[in-house]
Amino acid sequence: MEAGEEIEDGEPSTPTYKAHHPPPHLPPPMRSSGVSLVLSVADLVLRFVAIGGTAGSAIAMATTSETLPFAAPFVRFRAEYSDLPTLMFFVVASSVVCAYLVLSLPASVVHVVRPGARSSRAILAFLDTVMLALLTASASAAAAIVYLAHRGSARANWLGICQQFTSFCQRITASLVGSFAAAVVLVALVFLSALSLARRA
């Protein structure tokens, strides 16, 4: 029936309109909090893995040494990490990152209990990025020294020492592997923090 149309008794009819009600507001799915909890637990587990990698790398590098006897009496060749400042920087940086990861464990536990925390997670993500940069810089510098120890440099007339100091080179190489593995874990930690913050934005 159109507006203004007259009905049988001669009176105009009034237009009728259908009311449109907005759809009811549905609560957010419970799966969101479950995903945040999984991300927080993964963050905590990865921190333990990174602690093991950095601690193992620092200990392996700081305790490595090898002495070669020489034909002449009282003459020995000894190789230690402290002979090279780059390797000393590697040990210090790995120790600092390991200490930071240990101190960050309480905050990670809080995120498991309260997955919705934002400010502490943002601070942790920033510090994780700083520690990642420090660990990557020290490991990259140490990797250059380890490469020279294995291959030497023909242009600089440097000879490799790993044919003589086999045990020393094996330990510092294993230390680098653990350090780069910890760096990969830190990348994963930064990604998890960014993902959690993006979900809460």
From Swiss-Prot:
This protein's UniProt keywords: Cell membrane, Cell wall biogenesis/degradation, Membrane, Transmembrane, Transmembrane helix
Disordered: annotated segments: 1-26
Cytoplasmic side: 1-34, 108-128, 193-201
Extracellular side: 56-86, 150-171
Principal location listed in the UniProt entry: membrane
Residue spans of biased composition, Acidic residues class: 1-11
Residue intervals passing through the bilayer: 35-55, 87-107, 129-149, 172-192
Annotated InterPro entries: CASP/CASPL, CASP_dom, CASPL
GO cellular component, as recorded: plasma membrane
Cell compartments where the protein resides: Cell membrane
GO biological process, any: cell wall organization
Self-association and partners: Homodimer and heterodimers.
Role this protein plays: Regulates membrane-cell wall junctions and localized cell wall deposition. Required for establishment of the Casparian strip membrane domain (CSD) and the subsequent formation of Casparian strips, a cell wall modification of the root endodermis that determines an apoplastic barrier between the intraorganismal apoplasm and the extraorganismal apoplasm and prevents lateral diffusion.
Official protein name in the record: Casparian strip membrane protein 5
